[in-house]
C-alpha cells in the first residue's frame, strides 16, 4: 500500500470544518473573537450591535444612560460626527456614566466598550453592581486622544437587576465612553462555540479514497487509522518520582505530550549551596521525556518572588548578585539549549521585582536577551498569574501584560521568539472574562500557553476544572496546555488538583481529563472505518501525524492532518 500525494485525479484532503455540538445542532449566536489592541482615532461599531445595551453608540444623546457617583455627564459629537458620552467633574473613582440592565444567572455575558480619557492615560475598569455585589468585568489602559477597546465578561450568581459603570482611581481625568456592548449567551450557545472552535481549529475534515494499483476504487474496504502524534501539546507537570516509577511513567505517557518540571530545574533546586550545582534530577527527568517523545518547557531560569530566593542569594551584594545571575543563566540555558521548547525566563515579574529592584529595571530585558543568544530555537515566555484568573488584579491585567511585552519587544528588536505564559491557577473562573482576555492577548499574534492549570479545592472544583479546560482548549489563540501538580506520592496532597491517587487510579479530575481526551480524539488513537461504494471515507481528525493500514495488510503508511495542507491530494493505494 502507498499514499499518493500528487495527480489531478486524486482525492482531495478537505480541511473544511465540521461543526459538531455533542450530537445536538444548536442555532447559536456566533461569538465574536475580535479584539483590537491598537488605539484608534474613532471607535468601531459596537459588537453584536450593542446586545442588550440601550443606545450603545450614543446616537440618541443620553437616552438609556445616567449619572453614577455624583459626576456630570454630557453627550458630545466629534468633528467627524462620532457620538459619545463624557463623564467629567469627577470627585471619586467610580464617578462615571452608567446603564441599568437585567442579568440572568444561567447566562454568560461578554462585554465591550471603547474608552478614552483626558489629561493623562489611566486604567479604567468596567464594574457591574448586582445582587452579588460589585464585580469588575474587565479593564483597559485608556489613552488620551484616541480610543481603546475594553473587553471582558461577567456572570452572576442570582438573576435580577444590575447596573454597570466605569471607574478609574485618577479623579483628575474625564472618562469618554462609546460603542458599548453587553451580549448574553445561553450555556448551550457557549458550549457550541467551544465545539465549533475545537472542530475548526484543532481538527480537519479528511476525505480519503482507497484504490487498487490501477486506480480503481475499492469499495467497502476496512481501514485502520492510527494517531501517532497530536499537534496540539497537552500535558501536565511532573516531579522526580517519575524517573523510577513505572506506573507513573505509563500513566503519563499514555495521555500527555508535553511537561514542565515542578521544581527540579529551578535555581533553588540546582544550586542549593552557592557554587555547588547539581542537575542530576533534572537530567534524569529530561532523559525520560526525550525517550518518550515528551516536549519539555524550561521552568524557570529566575523567579522574581522574594520568598523563593535562597538564603545565600539574599546575602549577596548587588555586584555579587549580578555575577551569580550571569552564572545561573549561562549554566542552565547552555545545558538545556535545544532540548526544551520554551523558557520561563523571569517568572512572575508582573507581580514581583526582586531582581529588578537590585539589578536595575531593565534586568528582565537583559535576561531575555541573553537567553535568546544561548538558545536560538526556544520560545521565551513571560509567565504570570491572575491575567485570566482574576479580572480585578491590576498588576497582571491584559493591558499590563501587553505593555510589558511591548517593552520587551522594543528592547530586543524582534531578535527572540516571545510567548505569553498564563499560569491559570483558578478559584472560581469567570468564563466569559477568560475568553475575552484570551481574545485580547491573541491580538498580539504571540503564542499563548496555559502553563500551570489547576483549580483550588472547593465544592465545585471538578465542575470548574472541566469548564476552564474546555474553554482554554477551544480558544484559537491557545497553543498548548500544561496542568499543574496532578499527582503526589502522599495521596491527595497535590498543589491544588490531583488527577489520580497514589496508585494512579483516576480521581474525579482524572475522569474529566480522560473524558475530554476521548471527545477530542486523543484517546481514540485507532479509528476503524469502511469505505463507501466509491472507495471513500470521511473522518474528522485531529491535526497530527497518522498511520493508515488496510485490513489484512501489515504495512502502514503515514499522512499528516494540518490546516496548512488545505487542498492537498491524498490517495491510498492498496
Q: Predicted regions: what is each one?
A:
Residues 258-272, 281-389:
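Substrate-binding cleft and catalytic face of glycoside hydrolase catalytic domains
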Residues 183, 262, 346, 423, ...:
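Conserved residues at the C-terminal ends of beta-strands
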Residues 233-235, 257-260, 293-297, 340-344, ...:
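Structural preference for beta-strand elements that scaffold enzyme active sites
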Residues 243-254, 280-292, 330-335, 369, ...:
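Short amphipathic alpha-helices and their capping/turn segments at secondary-structure boundaries
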Residues 4-238, 242-255, 315-316, 375-378, ...:
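Extracellular and organelle-lumenal recognition/adhesion modules and their flexible linkers in secreted
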Residues 218, 237-249, 354-460:
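Noncatalytic carbohydrate-binding groove/subsite architecture in carbohydrate-active enzymes
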Residues 37, 66, 188-193, 197-199, ...:
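Aromatic-rich peripheral "rim/lid" segments of glycoside hydrolase catalytic domains that contact
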